[in-house]
C-alpha cells in the first residue's frame, strides 16, 4: 500500500470513503478465496494447481480459489505507476464502437472504414488533451487496425489481441515501441473466465506484453447494488487476472482496467454511462488502485445521449471535471462515444476535445461521498456468483442510490 497516496486520497475523498475502499480490497480478496473464479483453461488451472500443496490456492471442479497470501504476493510483483508509460490524469479515446454516427444525416449504424480509423488516430496524436487511445471503432481486420494505430499515433495504445497472428503482430510493434498494451476481457461477470480470450491472454503474458485487464460487473445485475459491492466484484475479477499474469510471468506489467458499471432500472437494467454515479464509481476504483500502486484505467466522461446534444456536452464536462477534481491515472471512453458505446461520433469527438481543453475542477458537481455499506458483502455471501437483479439489496436501493 502506498501510504503517501492513502493520505492524498483521504484529503480529497474523506477518511470514511478511503476506509471503504480499503475494505473493498479485503472484500475482493474474500471473494477470490471463498467464491472463486470458474475456469476451463488448462494452462491457467495448472498455474494454480501447482500451488495447492502450499495451501496458496485450491482448484475444485474447475473453479480456482486464491488464498489471501497469494493475492497479496502477486500484487507486489506488478510494476508500479511510476514505472508506467502513461502519466496520471490521462484521458484516452477508448472503447470499440461497432458503428459510426453520421452527424450530417442524424443517424447511426454506419460501418467504420480505414479512413475513420486513420482520422481517429491522427486526432489522438494531434490533440494535447488526449493522452492515448484504444481502438475507438471496430474494424474487421484487427491486425490492420493495430498497424494503423501504431503508424498514426505515437502515444500509448491499447488493443485487443484475439488470434495468434494478432499476438505476433503485437510483439512486433512492442519490439519497436514499449508504450502499448494488449487488452483482454479475461472474465465475464459474475466470476467466470471468458474462455474465448483466455488462450490468447496466456500467450500475450508469456510473450511479455503489458496486459490491460478489463472487467465490467454491472451493479444490480452481476454485482451488488451499492458502491462497495460493485467495486469489490470488479476488483476481484481483475485481481484474478493480475494473479494469473504474475504466476505465468512474474514482474509483467498489468493494468487494472476494471470499470464498475451501474444498471439503471429506468432503462430496463441496461447500463447508464451518463450518471454522475458512473463517473464517481470509476474514480473510486482508480483511487483504490492508486493506493495499491497499480497502473489503472477506468471509464468516465460518457453520456447516455444517442446523439450530440446539450445534455451530452454537459455529461462530458461533468465527467471530466469530476476526474480532475479528485484525480485518477487513466480514463477511457472519454471522447466521441454515444449511448452504450454503440456509435462513434466525430462531431462529439471534436466537441469533447474542446470541452476537455477548457474544463476545470470547479465545474464538477457536488457529490456525496459513499461510505461502506455492510449489506453489499451480505449480498455477495447470499447471491455469490449468480445474478443480482432480484437480490434484496437491489430492490431496497432502487431509487435511492445511483439516481443522478
Question: At which residue positions do the language-model features occur?
Answer:
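Short beta-alpha connecting loops at secondary-structure transitions
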Residues: 9-13, 267-273, 301-308, 336-348
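Flexible, glycine/charged-enriched surface loops at secondary-structure junctions
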Residues: 38-45, 58-60, 249-255, 293-299, ...
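Glycine-rich, N-terminal phosphate-binding loop and its surrounding beta-alpha-beta segment
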Residues: 42-105
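Helix-rich catalytic cores of soluble enzyme domains
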Residues: 108-329
Amino acid at each position: 500500500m502506498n501510504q503517501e497516496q492513502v493520505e492524498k486520497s483521504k484529503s480529497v475523498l474523506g477518511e470514511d470513503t478511503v476506509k471503504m475502499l480499503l475494505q473493498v480490497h479485503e472484500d475482493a480478496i474474500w471473494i477470490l478465496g471463498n467464491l472463486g473464479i470458474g475456469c476451463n483453461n488448462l494452462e491457467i488451472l495448472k498455474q494454480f494447481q501447482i500451488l495447492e500443496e502450499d495451501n496458496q490456492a485450491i482448484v475444485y471442479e474447475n473453479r480456482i480459489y486464491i488464498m489471501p497470501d497469494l493475492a497479496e504476493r502477486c500484487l507486489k510483483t506488478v510494476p508500479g505507476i511510476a514505472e508506467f508509460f502513461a502519466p496520471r490524469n490521462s484521458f484516452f479515446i477508448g472503447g470499440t464502437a461497432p458503428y459510426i454516427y453520421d452527424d450530417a444525416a442524424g443517424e447511426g449504424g454506419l460501418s467504420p472504414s480505414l479512413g475513420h480509423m486513420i482520422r481517429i488516430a491522427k486526432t489522438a496524436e494531434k490533440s494535447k488533451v488526449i493522452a492515448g487511445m484504444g481502438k475507438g471503432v471496430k474494424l474487421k481486420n484487427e491486425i490492420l487496425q493495430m498497424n494503423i494505430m501504431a503508424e498514426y499515433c505515437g502515444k500509448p495504445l491499447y488493443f485487443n489481441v484475439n488470434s495468434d497472428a494478432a499476438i505476433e503482430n503485437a510483439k512486433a510493434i512492442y519490439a519497436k515501441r514499449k508504450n502499448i498494451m494488449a487488452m483482454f476481457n479475461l472474465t465475464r461477470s459474475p466470476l467466470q473466465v471468458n474462455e474465448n480470450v483466455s488462450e490468447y491472454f496466456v500467450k500475450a503474458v508469456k510473450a511479455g506484453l503489458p496486459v490491460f485487464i478489463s472487467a465490467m460487473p454491472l451493479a444490480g445485475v452481476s454485482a451488488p447494488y451499492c458502491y462497495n459491492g460493485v467495486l469489490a466484484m470488479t476488483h476481484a475479477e481483475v485481481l484474478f487476472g493480475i494473479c494469473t499474469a504474475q504466476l505465468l510471468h512474474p514482474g509483467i506489467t498489468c493494468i487494472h482496467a476494471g470499470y464498475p458499471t451501474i444498471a439503471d432500472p429506468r432503462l430496463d437494467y441496461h447500463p447508464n454511462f451518463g450518471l454522475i454515479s458512473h463517473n464517481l464509481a470509476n474514480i473510486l476504483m482508480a483511487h483504490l488502485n492508486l493506493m495499491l500502486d497499480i497502473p489503472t484505467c477506468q471509464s468516465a466522461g460518457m453520456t447516455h445521449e444517442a446523439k450530440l446534444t446539450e445534455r451530452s456536452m454537459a455529461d462530458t464536462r461533468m465527467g471530466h471535471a469530476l476526474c480532475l477534481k479528485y484525480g485518477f491515472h487513466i480514463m477511457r471512453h472519454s471522447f466521441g462515444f454515444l449511448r452504450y458505446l454503440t456509435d462513434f461520433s466525430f462531431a462529439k469527438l471534436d466537441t469533447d476535445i474542446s470541452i476537455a481543453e477548457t474544463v476545470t475542477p470547479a465545474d464538477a458537481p457536488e457529490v456525496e461521498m459513499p461510505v461502506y455499506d455492510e449489506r453489499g458483502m451480505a449480498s455477495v455471501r447470499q447471491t455469490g456468483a449468480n445474478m443480482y437483479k432480484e437480490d434484496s439489496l437491489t430492490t431496497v436501493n432502487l431509487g435511492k442510490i445511483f439516481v443522478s
